[in-house]
A protein has these predicted regions:
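Active-site nucleotide-donor binding segment shared across nucleotidyl transfer reactions
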Residues: 1-49
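Conserved NTP/Mg2+-binding pocket subregion across the NTase superfamily
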Residues: 57-181
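Cytochrome P450 catalytic domain signature, combining two hallmark sequence patches
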Residues: 52-55
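Short, solvent-exposed secondary-structure capping/transition elements
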Residues: 44-47, 99, 182-183
Length: 183
């Protein structure tokens, strides 16, 4: 599915990155992270080939010509999930996928009637069963941050140099822990 179709079929789209959580560092290199959910067109849903699951668009990757390009000020990192994939992951308690359920109204880029209905179902989707996945995700983030699991991840070398670790990554890790406790 191409970007035009993914955006045309979107039912809800909003900010999901550090800005929406109040964790942006205002260092002039903030990108814009957005997530959306779309209802794939009938021809995609009924296709004989692998069904559409997600569309990813990154202006940094497009500009640099490589997928691992670091986003800079003004870049857009957009992921649009099919409703089918989003639902499967949400019911498993995936912390990232559930962000759109809690994104404040003023941080939504787009929300039609179906998107509003989906967001209204939040109490039916979220249960205490999500605490396990949240805890697992939190532990994996900590292990990546400290190098206990695989190679130590350094996304922001300037923060690593200044504080000894990536403080923004650490704040996202703590946010996940608090969100999991609140469920």
């Amino acid at each position: 599915m191409n970007r035009e179709t993914a955006e045309r079929c979107t039912i809800v789209r909003g900010l999901v990155g550090s800005t929406v959580h109040g964790l942006n560092v205002n260092d002039g290199i903030e990108d814009r992270d957005e997530m959306g959910i779309c209802v794939e067109p009938l021809e995609e849903a009924m296709a004989l080939w692998a069904p559409f699951e997600q569309f990813i668009y990154r202006t940094a990757a497009e500009r640099e010509g490589r997928d691992d390009a670091r986003s800079t000020a003004g870049d857009l990192d957009l992921t649009i999930y099919s409703l089918r994939k989003w639902t499967r992951l949400a019911l498993k308690g995936n912390p990232t996928i559930m962000l759109l359920l809690f994104t404040p109204e003023d941080q939504l880029v787009y929300c039609d009637e179906l998107g509003a209905e989906l967001r209204a179902l939040t109490p039916a989707i979220v249960s205490r069963r999500v605490q396990g996945p949240f805890l697992g995700y939190l532990q994996a983030q900590k292990q990546r941050l400290t190098g206990e699991r695989g190679q130590k991840r350094i996304h922001r070398p300037e923060l690593e140099e200044m504080y000894g670790f990536d403080t923004k990554y650490a704040m996202h890790m703590l946010r996940l822990g608090f969100q999991g406790v609140g469920c």
